[in-house]
Regions:
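Nucleotide-sugar donor-binding/catalytic module of glycosyltransferases
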Residues: 1-218
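Membrane-interface aromatic/basic loop that binds lipid-linked glycans or pyrophosphate carriers
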Residues: 1-3, 32, 44, 229-249
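Catalytic core of nucleotide-sugar-dependent glycosyltransferases
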Residues: 192, 204-205, 216-240
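A sequence-level detector of short, solvent-exposed, charge-rich linear segments
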Residues: 100, 105, 187, 221, ...
């Protein structure tokens, strides 16, 4: 079996207090395939860049790329990372997030049969606090079989637990400031379906996600964007109905 080559993209800005555990979670992986770690920094003014440079020096087995410059927001930075990525699969692991345990990547790729037939690999997500302590499992659970229509019921898979084949990945649509990841995941899955690729459910927690991200801080604006995205892909009336059902979930 060919070993998939993975690109992990991490976006940072003044993240010295939480970035360390993100970098450590990548460095401790038992996975023996080639991994590149692309870190896109928004011109941090704290010690974020020092942390990354030390990480790069101490872990030559990981191909670390650092870009630090002003950006136009999170999704602009993520697009910069996508342009640099060379891996067969791409994942996003932003500052404060971490791979769930040291076996995460090995479990994903060494146990995936025929990875060349896979469009997306996905799993569940734990929520952690600023100190990395477990708070709860994410409210929405990954469906048994994920398709592009699954997000009619909400974003059932956290972006950080969504590993996408790079050739399927479009740029993030910058018209969406808070929920472009929803639109992006749908487009990735639609493209995979058109290519006859399948999506693989790992049936395990892949990521510990830092509570209180940009979407939560801009909750109302994010909900409006998500409604627009869902109406675009699934139709206005089904989207209204599904949002009515959300009230009782």
């Amino acid at each position: 079996m060919n070993t998939p080559y993975l690109s992990i993209i991490t976006v940072t800005y003044n993240a010295e207090l939480v970035l360390g555990r993100t970098l450590e979670s990548v460095a401790m992986q038992t996975y023996r395939g080639f991994v590149e770690h692309i870190i896109v920094d928004g011109a941090s003014k704290d010690h974020t860049l020092e942390l990354v440079r030390t990480y790069k020096q101490e872990h030559p087995e990981i191909a670390v790329t650092l870009v630090s410059e002003p950006d136009k927001g999170l999704y602009d930075a993520m697009n910069k990372g996508l342009k640099l990525a060379k891996g067969e699969f791409v994942s996003f692991l932003n500052a404060g997030d971490r791979l769930h345990d040291k076996m995460t990547l090995e479990d994903i790729f060494d146990n995936a049969e025929h990875p060349e037939r896979i469009g997306v690999i996905y799993g569940d997500t734990n929520i952690v606090d600023n100190h990395g302590n477990y708070l709860r499992q994410r409210h929405l659970s990954a469906p048994e079989q994920l398709t592009w229509t699954s997000f009619q019921k909400g974003m059932l898979v956290c972006h950080q637990s969504f590993y996408a084949r790079r050739t399927l990945c479009p740029p993030y649509d910058l018209q969406y400031r808070f929920s472009s990841d929803v639109d992006w995941c749908i487009r990735v899955m639609k493209a995979g379906e058109e290519c006859g690729l399948t999506n693989l459910n790992m049936h395990s927690v892949l990521t510990d996600y830092l509570d209180g991200g940009m979407t939560l801080k801009n909750h109302r604006a994010s909900l409006i964007e998500r409604f627009r995205i869902m109406a675009h892909y699934y139709g206005l009336l089904p989207t209204i109905w599904n949002h009515f059902l959300f009230l009782f979930r």
